[in-house]
Amino acid sequence: MLTAERIKFTQKRGFRRVLNQRVDAYFAEHGLTQRDNPSMYLKTLIIVLWLFSAWAFVLFAPVIFPVRLLGCMVLAIALAAFSFNVGHDANHNAYSSNPHINRVLGMTYDFVGLSSFLWRYRHNYLHHTYTNILGHDVEIHGDGAVRMSPEQEHVGIYRFQQFYIWGLYLFIPFYWFLYDVYLVLNKGKYHDHKIPPFQPLELASLLGIKLLWLGYVFGLPLALGFSIPEVLIGASVTYMTYGIVVCTIFMLAHVLESTEFLTPDGESGAIDDEWAICQIRTTANFATNNPFWNWFCGGLNHQVTHHLFPNICHIHYPQLENIIKDVCQEFGVEYKVYPTFKAAIASNYRWLEAMGKAS
C-alpha cells in the first residue's frame, strides 16, 4: 500500500482558488460570520432540550415499559441530531472560533461512547484528506465486514451485504466503544497510519469517560430501580436506533453509484486532478431542498459543501451550494445530488449489491 506521504494531487486548475474567492465574497457581502452564529446557538438549545427531555422521560415517566422503549428511540434520534449538528461541527472547529469551545462540545462524542480524539484523526485527517481511497480512508474500509470499494478484495459473504449491513448498523456504537480501547492500548494505527500519541491526561480522559459512560447508561437506571433486563433492553434499543440512524446518513455521502473511488498511480502515488475536485468526484448530496433533512442532518445531506468547507458552520451550507454549483459548471465538474432521501438510499443499496458480486 502507498504511504500517505506518496499520495499527491497533481493538478492545480484554479478551481479551489476561484471557489474560495466566491465564498469569501458571499460572507463579506452579507456581513456573516462563518462560525459563532446565533441561529446555531438556538438550534443547539432546541436539540439539548429535546435530548434531556427524552432522557428524563425514559428514566422517570410513569409509563409501561413498551412506551418507555419508544422513549428510548426518541432519545436515540435526539442523540443522533446532537451528534450531527453540534458534535460534528465542533470536532471540525466549525461551531466556534474559540478552540476551547469546540474542544468541549466535541468531547460530547466521548459521552456518547466514541473517542473524539480518535474520531478527529480518522475522520478529519484520513477521511477528509484521502476520501474514497482504499487503504487510507478508514470510513470505506468496513473492517472486512462489507465491501464498499471496487478495489477491495471480494469474498463470498459480500453477495448478501446489501441485506445484512442493516444488522451491522445496530451494533456499530458498541463496536466503536470497544474498538477505541483496542486501538489505543494495542493496535495503535489505522492501516499504516500511526495514531498520534496520547498524552497521559488524554488517555486517562478517554478511559475514564468510557467508565463514566457505563455508569450513566447502565448504573444510573439500575440505581433508580430498573431491573437488569430492562436496563439491557433499554440501552440496546437506544444505541441500536442511534447506530442505524447515524450509519445510514454517513453512508449516503460516498458509497453510491455516482461517487468515484480513486486509485493513485502505483509507482508515483499521483492522482491526476486537483484535491478539491476529487472531493466533488467522490461525494454526493441528497435532499438538499428538504427542510427536515437540512435541519436534522447538520449539513450531512450537503456533503459536497462539507468536504470543501468543513470549518464553516453547516447552517450556511444551503446558501453555499449554489456558489459551488456555479463554479463546478464553469470548470466542467459534475456536481452530484440525489433529489430525495429515498433516491440516495436506493443508490446505496444498488451499489452495495454490485460490490457484493465477484469482479
From Swiss-Prot:
What's the source species' lineage? Bacteria, Bacillati, Cyanobacteriota, Cyanophyceae, Synechococcales
InterPro entries assigned to the protein according to its UniProt record, in alphabetical order:
FA_desaturase_dom, Fatty_acid_desaturase
The UniProt gene name for this protein comes to desD
Which processes are annotated in GO (biological process)? lipid metabolic process; unsaturated fatty acid biosynthetic process
Question: Which molecular-function annotation in GO is an example for this chain?
Answer: acyl-CoA 6-desaturase activity
Instruction: Please report the name of this protein according to its UniProt entry.
Output: sn-1 linoleoyl-lipid 6-desaturase
Q: What phenotype is described for loss of this gene?
A: The disruption mutant does not contain any fatty acids with a double bond at the carbon 6 position. Disruption does not affect growth of cells. The growth rate of the desA-desD double mutant, which lacks polyunsaturated molecular species of membrane lipids, is dramatically lower at 20 and 25 degrees Celsius than that of the wild-type strain.
Q: Where is this motif: Histidine box-2?
A: 123-128
Q: Which GO terms describe its cellular component?
A: membrane
